[in-house]
A protein has these predicted regions:
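Alpha-helical junction/boundary sensor with strong preference for TPR arrays
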Residues: 33, 111-112, 159, 166
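TPR-repeat structural position
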Residues: 97, 145, 192-193
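Single conserved hydrophobic/aromatic residue that forms the stacking wall/gate
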Residues: 199-211
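N-terminal J-domain/J-like co-chaperone modules of DnaJ/Hsp40 proteins
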Residues: 1-38, 49, 53-56, 63-72, ...
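Structural register within alpha-helical repeat arrays
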Residues: 86-87, 128, 135, 176, ...
């Protein structure tokens, strides 16, 4: 699986970061797990991916080779299937919840559907819910309330389908309810814009036709 992520974003540093800053960021990421609900297995894989990135970026020769690849147009990182969920988690943590949600949703669908009751199913379901919520927050910050609602609704549907995490589902439902007034205003403003555009178009036609 290739994810739209680079090693600097993965570990949470700028491309100009020193080795000391990278190691400090690495330790902070290890000490702070994103959510207590993830399984030990996926958290271990996450730690391994962070460690591999820290090792690469603190080795001068390996870092130079990687930076050359990026300069030559290399984009994204490849993750083995057994580390896919940890990779998706790191994508979400890097500030890309929309991309993380879409890819996680896909991983829950055939032919990739995880085995019922497996740790993979549990981790993907939790990640789908958390990333849908963060994606909705991003859309709301941009005043795209309908898009925010869509992310929340999809997150809720996934939790309903999986029959898991009723408390988290209730949180998403509360977030969706809180969005309702903003969605109404959003739809009304769109309708008003459509009316204005229609009026402007009709007025232009009248002028052209001598009306």
């Amino acid at each position: 699986l290739e994810l739209p992520l680079d090693h600097f974003r993965l570990i949470g540093v700028s491309p100009s970061a020193t080795s000391e800053e990278i190691l400090r960021a690495f330790q902070l990421r290890l000490d702070k797990t994103p959510n207590d609900g993830f399984t030990f297995e996926v958290l271990t894989q996450r730690a391994e991916l962070l460690r591999l990135t820290a090792d690469l970026l603190t080795n001068a020769e390996n870092r130079k080779e990687y930076e050359d690849l990026v300069l030559n147009g290399a984009s994204g990182l490849e993750f083995a299937s057994n580390r896919e969920v940890a990779g998706l988690m790191l994508l979400w943590e890097s500030g890309s919840p929309k991309e993380a949600f879409k890819l996680t949703r896909k991983a829950l669908q055939p032919p990739q559907t995880p085995a019922l009751g497996s740790s993979r199913e549990a981790d993907l379901t939790l990640l789908a819910a958390l990333s849908s919520r963060d994606a909705a927050i991003k859309e709301q910050d941009q005043r795209c309330y309908s898009n925010a609602a869509d992310f929340l609704q999809e997150g809720i549907q996934i939790l309903q389908r999986m029959g898991k995490m009723s408390e988290l589902r209730k949180n998403l439902e509360d977030d969706l309810s809180a969005l309702l007034p903003y969605r109404i205003l959003d739809l009304l403003s769109r309708d008003l814009i459509d009316v204005c555009l229609l009026y402007t178009s009709d007025a232009a036609d009248d002028v052209l036709c001598g009306g």
